[in-house]
A protein has these predicted regions:
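Transmembrane helix-loop-helix hairpins at the membrane interface
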Residues: 91-227, 338, 441, 709
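Juxtamembrane coupling segments of multi-pass membrane pumps/enzymes
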Residues: 8, 179, 193-254, 285, ...
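Conserved ATP-binding TGD loop and adjacent catalytic N/P-domain core of P-type ATPases
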Residues: 4, 408, 499-501, 542-681
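Conserved cytosolic catalytic loops of P-type ATPases
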Residues: 31-53, 57, 189, 218-312, ...
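Flexible metal-binding regulatory segments at protein termini and peripheral loops
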Residues: 1-118, 219, 235-238, 316, ...
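Conserved catalytic phosphorylation-site environment of P-type ATPases
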Residues: 276, 372, 382-458, 613, ...
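Signature of the cytosolic headpiece of P-type E1-E2 ATPases
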Residues: 103, 466, 475-587, 602
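Membrane-embedded alpha-helical bundles of multi-pass transporters
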Residues: 112-115, 147, 166, 400, ...
């Protein structure tokens, strides 16, 4: 069976959180679907599925049967969704304006000029136009959901306004019914019209605010140009980037954005990669160098060969990761989804109960109060505020992170990150620049050409970061690669190689001890001096004899000290792990004011160290560059990988810091705390709003002070409850990290 695939599809026709639940539950039960998650704030469906068992088109058919729709089998579904969203917003704005233009005179007739001749008939006509022309979608959607055995916010609006209108219509056509009972026949046409006007206004403001929550994704997608100049048979032709294929030649001129990932095949230039890497200095590119989509060519013109197009570009992968993260669900959202699923039926039940209680307590004389209270209960209840509480905060938080070169994998990672109280830092590539260089060497005896050739060959076969430093150092010695009998890399220790039956080795002090090689006193004194300067020591020998010792320096990043201090100010305990010797570890720890450190650690030691911290009740984040860190990253509560924009280890860690700036680490933790706090605030206010609003609408205060909530005010409260949740989430966007 083919491996699982993940696809993100735009969803159409959703109006509230209940709709999102309906779509999600519809897709979840389809054969071949492993996971399905709907983000109401983004109007997207994320599905993990088996392509051999089900296709996106089959998913669409199932969703259509449930009364909704998906955008599939188009070249750019996101662009289609954006265009549909723009059209939806324009239509919503027209309906809102139209509803208010008629609702204002309707409200004046109903509340100020009540005794206007023929006033009831005029109000009935105005209300009918508002309902049929501008509020039509509420009734269409409400009926559609009823036919599918479900209910949503549209159901509540359709029910409440229809009840108010039909009651008023009856009283207009047949007022004698109430006169015969000695009662005044009241009409509430203004309630029908103004409720729709307020709900439309709320949805308009909500849509506008929701669009702001996705601005980060839009700005990322906007980095990539829409067209490119493809070169064929020496001729340039401007084509959509969707037509580019791997292997195509593309011409890039000064000042243009690079359209796809590729390698320079002719010419040279300097490229601004700051939008991906965060590095402000342009990078010189010449033949054979890699260039990335979305980066800006500055001075020269060049030809490039496309190596990554469409969804295979680094920029697209970042966008996909952020979209997936925004669509993920925090653990608390699962509870909210269950509540949203039964919310509307419960509200309808409460409205019926309210109506019955009023009639039982007050009799037929309280019929109008009973009706108004039931309508208010239907109107004031808002599943949207609950449904928007978590996803809007996640969208803004994840988007802000992406804008600041922080990629958070999902809501689970975000929630765990905010709980971290201990950070474990790997030295090489995390605290240091990751650009090591040999600064000193000590040969026990004079270096022969054979010794240099064997060392060069060993390092050529090694993938360790320090190997590149030794190779660069050997370039000036004319050392050359030779044939070796065998080669073995020993994780955490070094490499050993057989040449003509003799074992040569290069590595750490642990390797030195494994081969029981002795360090001469004069070499030992040099080693102590180098370690006190914070340098890494590499030993080179054959069998049990030491041949040479090299000191390798990897400068600390300018922001490492500031980042460590920022973490400590946040109350986070900082630990340093390194494979270097004790003196080197002590020196680096002292330079950065890190109290907890451990030297001479192997990859397995890192995992055990984190396990011991967790056993002591710590919530641990491990920060590394992905090299020799995989076990420790997997063990940590939160794994954080350092990247450089062009080489993002997105599959390695829960959090990826795209640039090499360690200050992103405290920024990421601050962002997680603020996002989670925003989620909790949103949920608190959404629940409190409904817990207080529904009893008020039912008339619980009427026996105390005669207060009865007008349905129009109830609709205004409902409209602005969801808007307030989105606005609270947007505070994240405007805050500084």
């Amino acid at each position: 069976m083919k491996d699982l695939e993940t696809i993100i599809l735009p969803v159409l026709e959703m109006s509230c959180a209940v709709c999102a639940n309906n779509v999600e539950n519809t897709v979840k039960v389809l054969p071949g679907v492993e996971e399905a998650s709907v983000n109401f704030a983004a109007n997207t469906l994320s599905v993990k599925y088996h392509p051999s068992l089900i296709t996106p088109q089959k998913m669409r058919e199932a969703v259509q049967e449930a009364g909704y729709d998906l955008v599939v089998e188009v070249e750019d579904p996101t662009a289609v969704q954006e265009e549909m969203a723009r059209e939806h917003y324009r239509k919503l704005r027209r309906n809102t304006i139209g509803a208010w233009v008629l609702s204002i005179p309707l409200a004046l007739l109903g509340m100020v000029f009540m005794h206007t001749p023929g006033g009831n008939w005029i109000m009935m006509a105005l209300a009918l136009v508002i309902m049929i022309v501008f509020g039509r979608s509420f009734y269409v959607n409400g009926v559609r959901h009823a036919l599918h055995g479900s209910a949503n916010m549209d159901t509540l609006v359709a029910l409440s306004t229809s009840i108010a209108f039909l009651f008023s219509f009856f009283n207009t056509v047949y007022p004698r019914f109430w006169y015969e009972k000695g009662l005044e026949p009241h009409v509430y046409y203004e309630a029908s019209g103004v409720i729709i006007a307020f709900v439309l206004l709320g949805k308009l403001l909500e849509e506008r605010a929701k669009n702001s929550t996705s601005s980060a994704i839009k700005s990322l997608m906007g980095l990539q140009p829409k067209t490119a100049r493809r070169v064929r048979d020496g001729q340039e032709e401007e084509v959509s980037i969707s037509f580019l294929r791997v292997g195509d030649l593309v011409s890039v001129r000064p000042g243009e954005k690079i359209p796809v990932d590729g390698t320079v095949s002719q010419g040279s230039s300097s490229v601004d990669e700051s939008m991906l890497s965060g590095e402000p200095i342009p990078v010189v590119k010449s033949q054979g160098d890699r260039v990335l989509a979305g980066t800006i060519n500055q001075k020269g013109a060049f030809l490039m060969e496309a190596t990554g197009v469409g969804s295979a570009t680094v920029l697209s992968q970042i966008v996909q990761m952020v979209q997936a993260a925004q669509g993920s669900k925090a653990p608390v959202q699962r509870i909210v989804d269950k509540i949203s699923g039964i919310f509307v039926p419960i509200v309808v039940g409460l409205a019926i109960l309210t109506f019955i209680v009023w009639l039982v307590v007050g009799g037929s004389g309280y019929f109008s109060y009973a009706l108004l209270s039931a309508v208010s209960v239907l109107v004031i209840a808002c599943p949207c505020a609950l449904g928007l509480a978590t996803p809007t905060a996640l969208m803004v938080g994840m988007g802000k992170g992406a804008e600041h070169h922080i990629l958070i994998k999902d809501a689970f990672a975000l929630e765990n990150l905010c709980k971290v109280d201990t950070v474990v830092l790997d030295k090489t590539g995390t605290l240091t620049e990751g650009v090591p260089e040999v600064t000193d060497s000590f040969w026990i005896s004079e270096a022969s050409r054979d010794m240099l050739d064997i060392l060069y060959t060993a390092e050529m076969k090694s993938e360790h970061p320090l190997a590149s430093a030794i190779l660069s150092w050997l370039k000036g010695t004319e050392a050359a690669e030779i044939d070796a009998d065998s080669f073995e890399s020993v994780t955490g220790r070094g490499i050993q190689m057989q040449v003509h039956g003799v074992t040569y080795w290069v590595g750490s002090k642990g390797f030195l001890e494994t081969f029981k090689a002795m360090v001469p006193p004069e070499a030992g004194r040099e080693i102590i001096r180098w370690e006190e300067d914070g340098k890494s020591i590499v030993y080179y020998g054959w069998e049990s004899e030491l041949l040479a010792v090299m000191a390798i320096s990897d400068r600390l990043k300018p922001t490492s000290g500031e980042a460590v201090e920022a973490l400590k100010e946040m109350g986070i305990e900082v630990h340093l792990l390194t494979g270097d010797g004790k003196r080197t570890a002590e020196t680096v720890a002292a330079m950065l004011d890190i109290r907890h450190y451990k030297a001479d650690v192997l990859p397995s030691d890192k995992e055990e160290y984190i396990r011991s911290l967790q056993a002591a009740g710590k919530k641990v984040a491990m920060v590394g560059d992905g090299i020799n860190d995989s076990q420790a990253l997997a063990r940590a509560d939160v794994s954080i990988a350092m990247g450089k924009g062009t080489d993002i280890a997105m599959d390695v860690a829960m959090v990826t810091l795209i640039t090499s700036d360690l200050m992103l680490l405290p920024d990421a933790i601050r962002l997680s705390k603020r996002t989670v706090r925003s989620i909790h605030q949103n949920l608190f206010w959404a629940f409190i709003y409904n817990l207080i609003g529904i009893p008020l609408a039912a008339g619980v205060l009427f026996p105390v002070n005669g207060l009865l909530l007008n349905p129009m005010l109830a609709s205004a409260a409902m409209a602005f409850s969801s808007v307030s949740v989105v606005l609270n989430s947007l505070r994240l966007k405007w805050s500084k990290l």
